[in-house]
Amino acid sequence: MSLLLEPSPTMIKEQKMYRDMGLTDEEFAMIERILGRLPNYTETGIFSVMWSEHCSYKNSKPVLKKFPTEGKHVLQGPGEGAGIVDIGDGLAVAFKIESHNHPSAIEPYQGAATGVGGIIRDVFSMGARPIALLNSLRFGELTSPRVKYLFERVVAGIAGYGNCVGIPTVGGEVQFDAAYEGNPLVNAMCVGVIRHEDIQKGIASGVGNTVMYVGAKTGRDGIHGATFASEELTEQSEQKRPAVQVGDPFMEKLLLEACLEVIHCDALVGMQDMGAAGLTSSSAEMASKAGSGIELNLDLVPQRETGMTPYEMMLSESQERMLLVVKKGREQEIMDVFSKYGLEAKAIGRVTDDHMLRLYHRGEVVAEIPVDALAKDAPVYHKPSQEPAYYREFQTMEYVPTVDNYEETLLALLSQPTIASKEWVYEQYDYMVRTNTVVAPGSDAAVLRIRGTNKALAMTTDCNSRYVYLDPEVGGKIAIAEAARNIVCSGAQPLAVTDCLNFGNPEKPEIFWQLEKAVDGMSEACRILETPVISGNVSLYNETNGEAIYPTPIVGMVGIVEHVDHITTQAFKQPGDLIYIIGEAKQEFGGSELQKWLTGRIFGKAPTIDLHVEVKRQQQLLTAIRAGVVASAHDVSEGGLAVALAECVMSAQGLGARVEMKGDVVAELFSETQSRFIVSVKKEHQQMFERLVQAVRIGEVTNDGTLHVTAEDTCILHVPVETMRNVWKGAIPCLLKSKD
């Protein structure tokens, strides 16, 4: 589109063309008042992306304020590219999780790949070297041809990008439920390490300083990507494929290394990724944070397509681009660094003192907007909230299953895609590149050593969205608690949280109620577990033709292993070790894998959780691990104790377990009661372990390669470990190969 063909401000208003960009009538009227005139086409587009939910959090901001964001280790909370936490020795860890759901539903390979690329840039824009990637994925049932296609292409996209950049993908989770049939979730997390003195911020300060553009040239891909991410998916969404960006991981690698070198150059003032809303968001946000203004000459923006308009250049979300602010007169120093990597750093503007975003094109001013109106003063909506009818109904329902054949039930649960081995997924990822990975994918948390120290980092992503659906507040608490449980089982102290809040349309009161209650639960858990929220992302409008996903607040958590000797895994270690269970089982089957397998649906009450009990048990276990008396540790989660035991023996080689159950055997084996751990201990450490931890001994590790469970001196389950392993490992590959 040429400038001559762009609609006039009057046409935009009279024909309500702004609605197609995602703006409401009231918002357009606000823009008129802010500018004191009608906005032109470029300005309307700029407001539309910056006031989208994806960029402004206009629907979720009142809820997000509930999160605790400060703590003794926090160096940088929400508001920058990533949060940062101190880990001692002058080092810090930077991390963040973000969604790329809508693009992945339309073009799964590039949608997932560019999600990885974007989160990597968020971390290295802070000055941190990315050391690990994780992801949290949700798909519909794996029996659907469409779901198989999305699953295979999303995993390929994550692998293709991460492997090429050379950052190990070390962990994550994949779950399958019909609620995600039309709207998969692709949440990507990146973790980086940084020295305190190298921390950068995305600010445009210093009047007269130069604004520089670095990285890939600007094309028309991703235009209105932020707006696209702020609306429901429909049958027409497939036509918006151009809104999905295309990534180049080799360019990303060069950009990463160049940016990590340039942070040591005194000429650099600030640096930010051109992510959602591209050049618009990076320039406006950097100026707003600094209390300055910014002028850009769009004729100087590197373009890979001819005839691009200001609207297209400002709204493009082409990947692998960074915006830098550099001290005036020292541009050559910056250019020399990037030139070493075959990259061009180009001056495209300057910092001003008038708090305006001013754009020039062909010698004319084509946009003039107050930066705070874009970056800080978007409208904020306090949406109505209403408890859904299903929730009241579920609170009155009791579900107590009957199990006739324990072996058949365990093998059936191990074959459920959500529980089954994800080896098919993570074997496509290079999780050992850079050789720092100590605990690879498949355990409670991934663990990476920190070179030059005796410390290590544990990291995980977690959320059982079924629990959040049944009871958002309780489910929110459990999401935080389970993440911390996984960190502790690895021998680490939980430090902080990054979250990705994936929900449906917030304009529906029942959906907003889910969001509000989930955040209430998460916030309470974060306060009690002392894990502040330091970064995150909100992804709303996850609906397909009016049907919402399960509310899915993904929790990314990082913990510190004070000494590598404390690193613990779930695998049983040697015959004769004693097996303990921490925590008692209750008849809690709402949202459980057993309920889904037996009934084909999810209903009833979510498991309860006492956060003070949770903290006490985690602290006791971590103390025992640090005392060197724990051989293995694993949390009891999906599928209950039976599945947890199976995972402990399947993770070992040639070992088995003999366990005695007492009380309600179905609840003991298959209930998903919270705050429970399965631990193995050497016999010589028995007394010290029992002094440190309240736990019940239930059996011991054997060398016969079977899982043997008795109740009242009667064998109720006797399964060869190899049989379990074959079912568990083969489930997902078999489903992918099956013809529907």
UniProtKB/Swiss-Prot annotation:
Binding positions for ATP per the UniProt entry: 57, 96, 499, 536
Enzyme Commission code: 6.3.5.3
One term under GO cellular component: cytoplasm
Reactions it catalyzes: N(2)-formyl-N(1)-(5-phospho-beta-D-ribosyl)glycinamide + L-glutamine + ATP + H2O = 2-formamido-N(1)-(5-O-phospho-beta-D-ribosyl)acetamidine + L-glutamate + ADP + phosphate + H(+)
Keywords: ATP-binding, Cytoplasm, Ligase, Magnesium, Metal-binding, Nucleotide-binding, Purine biosynthesis
Binding site for substrate: 99-102, 121, 245, 317-319, 539
Residues holding Mg(2+) 1: 98, 537
Residues bound to Mg(2+) 2: 122, 273
Molecular function in Gene Ontology: ATP binding; magnesium ion binding; phosphoribosylformylglycinamidine synthase activity
Pathway entry: Purine metabolism; IMP biosynthesis via de novo pathway; 5-amino-1-(5-phospho-D-ribosyl)imidazole from N(2)-formyl-N(1)-(5-phospho-D-ribosyl)glycinamide: step 1/2
Name of the molecule in the record: Phosphoribosylformylglycinamidine synthase subunit PurL
Provenance organism: Anoxybacillus flavithermus (strain DSM 21510 / WK1)
Gene: purL
